[in-house]
Amino acid sequence: MKIETAASGKAFLSGEYMALDGGRAIILSTPQSAKVLISETNQTNNILVSSMSDHGYPFRIDEKLKIVWLKENPKQLGSILSEGISQFNKGFSGKSIAIDTSDFFCGERKIGIGSSAAVSAALTKALNKLLDLRLTSKAMI
């Protein structure tokens, strides 16, 4: 089993702060994208890996559908995954979740074009497939 998804970055042309209050904004998608790959492992625990880190973050999902980090907590990346599991109300085990945001960097410097939103969107699409939720694009928003 292998699930691959991607979501593009974004650049605001106008209305960035209006959008925060429910107003309208004009944005363009960018050629850079966040990529998520979910695959099977031979272990009972899961692991989260990211292009932004040189090590993995093993975790399990408890009976209350909360992530239990078995070593270090990956902070923001972990919170995006935790929110997805909470929203979908389903757990899983024995999976590797790889997040690649290397497109959003120039060398070691982040270029600032919506990588967090792209990770959220790509991860949501991947979890939708993994958990067989069959949500439409509109429902995932």
Give residue spans per PLM region.
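Alpha/beta catalytic cores of group-transfer enzymes, especially the acyltransferase/condensing modules
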Residues: 135-141
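ATP-binding N-lobe of GHMP and related small-molecule kinases
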Residues: 1-117, 125-135
